A protein has these predicted regions:
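Catalytic cores of Mg2+-dependent Asp-rich isoprenoid enzymes
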Residues: 1-88, 95-170
Length: 170
């Protein structure tokens, strides 16, 4: 793909002209693919906030950067805001899907925020809402949403860089 070849995959063949036309940066595509591959592991548990933010950058911050190219927003100052908006959206998704993710053996809440509870323990905590793990999970979700708000604020500052026609869609 990065060499400009799509092989036999029809989705990649369809993507290649857009990638070429919009000049998607290869390092951004690699980071996105790394994040998607990380999600394929049998068990996903993030150790700490740094791992959370690295994951969120890979699977969503990169999408913000790619959207800059799709929307023809080339101001260098816009990039950090685009990354932050993508990260904010991913953090919100993580907060929404804690139990669903735990059912799939995933825990995106940082282990340092939830006493390193594994996904099965997070899932079991739903049956004991007053238990210590449930309290830690609720506190972690609140902390996650607070962190997301900080990233949304930065993302919103970047709207001024968007072409006018893109404002409503973003």
């Amino acid at each position: 793909l990065l060499a400009g070849r799509s092989g036999d995959d029809p989705a990649l063949r369809a993507f290649l002209p857009l990638m070429t036309e919009k000049r998607f940066p290869p390092d951004v595509l690699i980071a996105l693919i790394d994040g998607l591959l990380e999600d394929q592991d049998d068990v996903v548990v993030l150790a700490d906030e740094a791992a959370l933010l690295r994951y969120a950058y890979r699977v969503a911050g990169t999408v913000g950067l790619l959207m800059c190219h799709v929307l023809d927003c080339h101001a260098p100052s816009a990039r950090a805001h685009a990354i932050d908006l993508g990260i904010a959206m991913q953090l919100t998704n993580i907060a929404r899907d804690v139990l669903e993710d735990a059912k799939m053996n995933r825990r995106y809440l940082p282990g340092t925020w939830v006493g390193n509870a594994d996904p099965a323990t997070v899932l079991a905590a739903a049956d004991d809402p007053d238990g210590s793990v449930a309290l830690e999970v609720r506190a972690a979700i609140a902390r996650l949403l607070s962190l997301a708000d900080q990233f949304y604020a930065s993302g919103a500052e970047g709207y001024r860089y968007l072409p006018w026609r893109a404002h409503m869609s973003i």
